[in-house]
Design a protein with these regions (language model features):
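Feature responds to low-complexity, polar/acidic, surface-exposed segments characteristic
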Residues: 1-11, 16-43, 52-72, 80-104, ...
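Alpha-helical membrane segments in multi-pass integral membrane proteins
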Residues: 131, 135-138
Length: 187
């Protein structure tokens, strides 16, 4: 949970979260990145999400699929994917200036309750996002709220590196254990 997650992995996660209709309407296997060729396992995910405006690359024409993703980049993707509407740019965090490229996304993500900062008032936008942080944000994008009752299901998958004392325990359990779900609620 505390390990890094790559840009290609994040693209694949959000691609798989698309509805069948959205995936079909926006399907693309073409992109302009010099480092994402058609034969790569993540090509369709990257190409489709770029076509939708959810993902972007770098000014040098690369996507850097194997690079770890930052918290700022992940906030931008989460906001773009969820189509959350932003308001005026506000600096909720001590290390996010209103002039930073990511400030509008961080503001919108905070306003939409997609992200949280650290107890010291910072967001640490350039830090690599952890798998646990990414999981918690994806749950929020989908409106999935971990439930104490869900943690008691029979046949629950437990993970050796995820204990009940971890801040991310409920988020990981919510995301990795099967249950019937519709946007924003359990069924």
């Amino acid at each position: 949970p505390n390990g890094r997650i790559t840009r290609a992995e994040v693209a694949t996660i959000f691609f798989r979260l698309l509805t069948d209709d959205a995936r079909q309407r926006n399907w693309s296997s073409e992109n302009n990145f010099s480092d994402v060729s058609a034969d790569k396992w993540y090509n369709n995910a990257v190409s489709t999400l770029c076509h939708m405006g959810v993902l972007g690359g770098y000014s040098d024409g690369t996507f850097r699929p194997n690079a770890p993703i930052t918290r700022a980049e992940f906030a931008k993707i989460a906001v773009s994917f969820s189509q959350a509407n932003g308001s005026a740019v506000y600096s909720y965090f001590t290390d996010v200036k209103t002039t930073d490229w990511f400030a509008p996304y961080v503001t919108t993500a905070k306003d939409s309750s997609l992200i949280e900062g650290y107890s010291d008032g910072s967001f640490k936008p350039e830090n690599r996002i952890t798998r646990a942080e990414a999981c918690a944000i994806v749950n929020r994008v989908l409106g999935r709220k971990p439930s104490k009752n869900h943690m008691k299901i029979s046949g629950r998958i437990d993970w050796p590196d995820c204990t009940t004392a971890d801040w991310f325990y409920e988020a990981i359990m919510e995301a990795t254990n099967s249950h019937t779900y519709q946007m924003g609620k359990r069924v």
